[in-house]
Design a protein with these regions (language model features):
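Conserved acetyl-CoA-binding loop-helix of GNAT-fold acetyltransferases
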Residues: 103, 109-122, 145, 149
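Conserved N-terminal entry element of GNAT/NAT acetyltransferase domains
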Residues: 1-16
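Conserved GNAT acetyl-CoA-binding A-motif
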Residues: 117, 124-135
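Conserved GNAT-fold acetyl-CoA-binding loop/helix
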Residues: 6, 19, 26-48
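Conserved beta-hairpin
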Residues: 57-71
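A short helix-loop-beta-strand connector motif used in the catalytic cores of GNAT acetyltransferases and
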Residues: 47-60, 76-80, 97
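C-terminal "cap" of GNAT-fold acetyltransferases
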Residues: 90-91, 130, 137-144, 148-150, ...
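Conserved acyl-donor/pantetheine-binding loop and adjacent beta-alpha core of acyl/acetyltransferases
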Residues: 72-100, 108, 161-164
Length: 177
């Protein structure tokens, strides 16, 4: 990971910069291949950050005052998760779920995503959780390569109910801790 990057829980004073992060990522995706299917003003937006902050589940990677990335870590599966055959069988009390892993375009290929995943895994172990689960829109090859490189195993492909946004299929991943 790039030297000087610190990963920590977000605080209210970070919200404007997180909103800016989301906006700049979506702007970048509009002019490049939009692997995750994110759209400015639709997802991710400030309200997503506010809700995660209120639940104490929003974490950020910072370089000085610049937010290079963020991730939401909670125990809330998407509705389609029940249709999968996971590696572990437990309640979501002992399973961490990764949502909205975001890296600013200026920090792509700098190890921010890998660092956020390592941070998530450490946080999950401390709870203690037995595994981490996540979903990624089918065809988001950069994200899938990252997850596979970090030891996540693809479980299956399901609908999460986002067909209206042109996102019919998601690949599910799990890493046993």
């Amino acid at each position: 990971m790039r030297q000087g990057i610190q990963i920590r829980k977000a605080v209210k004073a970070d919200l404007d910069r997180i909103e800016k992060l989301y906006g700049e990522i979506c702007d970048y995706l509009e002019s490049h291949r939009n692997y995750p299917g994110w759209r400015k003003g639709i997802y991710p937006v400030r309200q997503d950050a506010e809700e995660a902050l209120a639940a104490d589940t929003l974490h950020i990677a910072c370089l000085g005052k610049t937010i290079a990335g963020s991730v939401i870590l909670n125990h809330e599966p998407e509705k389609g998760y029940g249709n999968a055959r996971w590696l572990t069988a437990d309640t979501y009390t002992h399973i961490c779920v990764i949502h909205t892993l975001a890296v600013h375009p200026d920090f792509l290929k700098c190890g921010i995503g890998t660092g956020l995943l390592a941070y998530a895994e450490q946080a999950a172990r401390e709870e203690p959780c037995i595994s981490i689960r996540l979903d990624v829109v089918k065809g988001n090859l950069p994200a899938e390569r990252l997850y596979q490189k970090c030891g996540y195993q693809m479980i299956g492909t399901v609908s999460l109910g986002y067909e209206a946004y042109g996102l019919p299929w998601y690949n599910l991943y799990e890493k046993v801790l």
